[in-house]
Amino acid sequence: MCATVLGGIHPDTGRPYTIVEPQLGGWGGHAINDGSTAVFSGFHGMTFNCPVEINEARNGLFVERLELNPDPGGEGRQRGGKGIRADYRIRAAGGFLTCFYTRSKFPPWGLAGGLDGSPNYVEIRRADGTVERHAEMTNFGLKQ
């Protein structure tokens, strides 16, 4: 289970915004096929991803990257599916981040000789170049 809640004040409109985003993940491979890539689990219900252009306009942030996870993981005779990588850049100070990611310390395990999947995490990249990696945080203050 991976969930991200990101919010703040829109720099152009002054209105508060909140993004509640279950993360797309991959499913394990099986006997005859690779695993599915970038899918929501049944626990997410009728949830859809928001197009980048709408996300940027509504929420006053930049989506720097939205792609399949480029990290290695899940390789085997039938490869496990890939999750996503989403990079956001906030445009105004005073934002917050809450997240909870499972499989951060112990990645999804490989079966029948397949390799383990990649771990789940959030990276905070500061303007000074420092990087912090987290799997759980609540109301973490974000600076521009």
Predicted regions and their residues:
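Glycine/proline-enriched, intrinsically flexible loops and inter-domain linkers
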Residues: 1-144
